[in-house]
Design a protein with these regions (language model features):
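Active-site-adjacent pocket scaffolds in enzyme catalytic domains
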Residues: 1-62, 113-118
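C-terminal domain-boundary segment and adjacent tail
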Residues: 45, 49-119
Length: 119
């Protein structure tokens, strides 16, 4: 969904009665922050790493997900892409990270958290 409120998936009830999994989006940890905040690569990298570090620490007790909103015309600029490259290297240096899609997160949640789903 386009909800911006969590770093864990959860169910949203719909009018049809069939639940929908919310895998929240973030507008804060987003390459547009480079534009809004006037960040250079180092500032963007710091933002990505600080978000990751906090969520990684919290994930020791319960899973978390992190997404970064990326737009080719923003992050793809030569003076910005380094932040993404360096962040990916940084995150890959940590154990137990699942590189996946939002769709796969939703599917996993539905398959593994049946007790949360009202029938």
């Amino acid at each position: 969904t386009d909800l911006l409120n969590d770093d864990q998936p959860y169910l949203v009830q719909t009018r049809s009665g069939k639940p929908m999994v919310s895998v929240s989006y973030t507008s804060e940890v987003n390459d547009f922050s480079f534009l809004r905040q006037g960040l250079v690569a180092e500032g963007g990298l710091q933002m990505f790493q600080e978000q990751f570090d906090w969520l990684y620490e919290e994930s020791a007790s319960s899973g978390r997900f992190m997404n970064i909103g990326l737009h080719p015309h923003v992050i793809g600029q030569p003076y910005r892409i380094r932040a993404l490259r360096d962040f990916i290297r940084y995150a890959k240096s940590h154990d137990d990270i699942w590189w996946t899609t939002r769709e796969e997160i939703a599917e996993w949640y539905l398959e593994n958290h049946e007790s949360h789903i009202p029938i």
